[in-house]
Amino acid sequence: MGSGLFKPRVHPDLRDVFSKMSFFDKIGFLFIHAFDKRNLWHKVPVPIGLLYLNTRRTLLEKYNLLAVGRSSHGALFDPKEFLYRTEDGKYNDPHNAEAGSQNTFFGRNMEPVDQQDELMSPDPFVVATKLLARREYKDTGKQFNILAAAWIQFMVHDWMDHMEDTGQIGITAPKEVANECPLKSFKFHPTKELPTNSDGIKIGHYNIRTAWWDGSAVYGNNEERAEKLRTYVDGKLVIGDDGLLLHKENGVALSGDIRNSWAGVSILQALFVKEHNAVCDAIKEEHPNLSDEELYRYAKLVTSAVIAKVHTIDWTVELLKTKTMRAAMRANWYGLLGKKIKDTFGHIGGPILGGLVGLKKPNNHGVPYSLTEEFTSVYRMHSLIPSTLKLRDPTGQPDANNSPPCLEDIDIGEMIGLKGEEQLSKIGFEKQALSMGYQACGALELWNYPSFFRNLIPQNLDGTNRSDRIDLAALEVYRDRERSVPRYNEFRRRLFLIPIKSWEDLTSDKDAIETIRAIYGDDVEKLDLLVGLMAEKKIKGFAISETAFNIFILMASRRLEADRFFTSNFNEETYTKKGMQWVKTTEGLRDVINRHYPEITAKWMKSSSAFSVWDADY
């Protein structure tokens, strides 16, 4: 297809990439581009919206999956010898034993943009103070609660953490904002840069967590950690009599990933320890002769699949609350034929009709599986956390609004790290979960970043506290620059999205425009990614920006279809019949909570999803 013929129809900034596409890719691009120019795809009937999303995903899979580092194609193995998830993530991809394992490179969704000369431009302290720091708290209404905020942090503890360098660097707040900063300066470890020893991208960063959706926030990322969490009886994990995580003498929780956590993540880790142990009991009842190791492996597979399913068809559906996205996310799991057909007849057809889960073989689209730098960047969602938690009484009588009575307000800053574990032990699971369920989380917008994160005690890998506090808001701005993630406008171009020409294209908020202009001038190319994601006009029903959503489109599907335990090995032979039935009958977090705390759901959860505020009538 001649590029010249269609040149007037393509945005000038996207003509170069368009000209290099194949004939059929150009057709697909023109289709989505027509909707993008009119901001239409989310306003059209569901079938057309699904066609748009599938076309966009297909293009992103072709142009926005970049390998970093050499692929270990020589490390072949027999998948039948590894019908279980290894602790460090190895031996999942039959053609690349190392793919997705601990201490392998983050991939890329776009070529890196070196910003070593612009690490402090504009100053991260200024950006954090003038554009991110919370002023008047904004929440998400009934759509999304604090459990939903904790859930995505629970997932991040499963997916990704960058290896740090041993040395430290420091940054100091300029005089213009120093008096408004909780910390006037702070020290931190830079991200460790490693040579990739390959063509293409020369420098990369290691992910010290396993990139697979393998429940490593519960199980750990290596054998050393996993061994400390097991009872070695009937496949079970250690858990306190109170249903909370156990702790070492120094107060550090015993769980898969405990670094830089808070009480909200801890209760989800504890809940899924109970889920794992319940799966062990159920499978043992059907197979009484299984060993401890066999029960553990089966239960880990089942529990990891439950977590992935909850995220796919429950959490994401509430995050992106539109009819089209509900259909799209359910299609990822069940296919367009739907749950009844799939549960009755199994996987039929390809990924569209039958879904990504249960495909005959995994598909990594020719690029070794990993999570990416850009994926990390769009998951910077600390503004979801409110400043205070209204503690509610699960044993009390409903108040005038038919809600559990409030006991007190707790500063969520006191629920972070080791202090948070102490608080949680006094509060208990039921009270904590109920309180988080009944309270809306923060909105992902400008001026909504919690103040306690700007004076935060970071932790070492073993969960112990470091001596130097950090300003997390300023550090997050710095991290994207340090890791060569393109700034907002270029980020959009690389995703085939129409870039902004002025601040008015970004937002209609006059105060935001004035403040952004004061910091970045009129140069829209300087806008930091995090600021753009928070400032961007949102699609109705979306709790996140459309720009971030495009990374979701690509990577949410990839986490399922590249993993053989969600594709070729998603079967009774690998999971057991009871295990498969367990996954099939779990449709959301509500089901998991109901399994272990039925009195909470029966008395207090009126919403259909545990991620909506629990008194919501939907």
From Swiss-Prot:
Effect the entry attributes to changing residue 311 to L: Abolishes oxygenase activity
Glycosyltransferase listed as a keyword: no
GO biological process: (R)-2-hydroxy-alpha-linolenic acid biosynthetic process; cellular response to nitric oxide; cellular response to reactive oxygen species; cellular response to salicylic acid stimulus; defense response to bacterium; defense response to fungus; fatty acid alpha-oxidation; oxylipin biosynthetic process
Consequence the record notes for mutating residue 559 to K: Reduces oxygenase activity more than 100-fold
Binding site for hexadecanoate: 311, 599
EC number, UniProt record: 1.13.11.92
UniProt binding sites for heme b: 162, 382, 479, 483
Gene Ontology molecular function, alphabetical: heme binding; metal ion binding; oxidoreductase activity, acting on single donors with incorporation of molecular oxygen, incorporation of two atoms of oxygen; peroxidase activity
Reported effect, residue 276 to Q: Reduces oxygenase activity 3.75-fold
Organism, as annotated: Oryza sativa subsp. japonica (Rice)
Active site residues of this protein: 157
Textual note on the cofactor: Binds 1 heme b (iron(II)-protoporphyrin IX) group per subunit.
Effect seen on changing residue 559 to L: Abolishes oxygenase activity
Cellular component terms (Gene Ontology): monolayer-surrounded lipid storage body
Effect of residue 382 to Q: Reduces oxygenase activity 7.5-fold
Family affiliation: Belongs to the peroxidase family.
UniProt protein name: Alpha-dioxygenase PIOX
Outcome of substituting residue 559 to E: Reduces oxygenase activity 71-fold
Keyword vocabulary terms for this entry: Calcium, Dioxygenase, Fatty acid biosynthesis, Fatty acid metabolism, Heme, Iron, Lipid biosynthesis, Lipid metabolism, Metal-binding, Oxidoreductase, Oxylipin biosynthesis, Peroxidase, Plant defense
Residues at which Ca(2+) binds: 158, 210, 212, 214, 216
Enzymatic reactions: a 1,2-saturated fatty acid + O2 = a (2R)-2-hydroperoxy fatty acid; (9Z,12Z)-octadecadienoate + O2 = (2R,9Z,12Z)-2-hydroperoxyoctadecadienoate; hexadecanoate + O2 = (2R)-2-hydroperoxyhexadecanoate; (9Z,12Z,15Z)-octadecatrienoate + O2 = (R)-2-hydroperoxy-(9Z,12Z,15Z)-octadecatrienoate
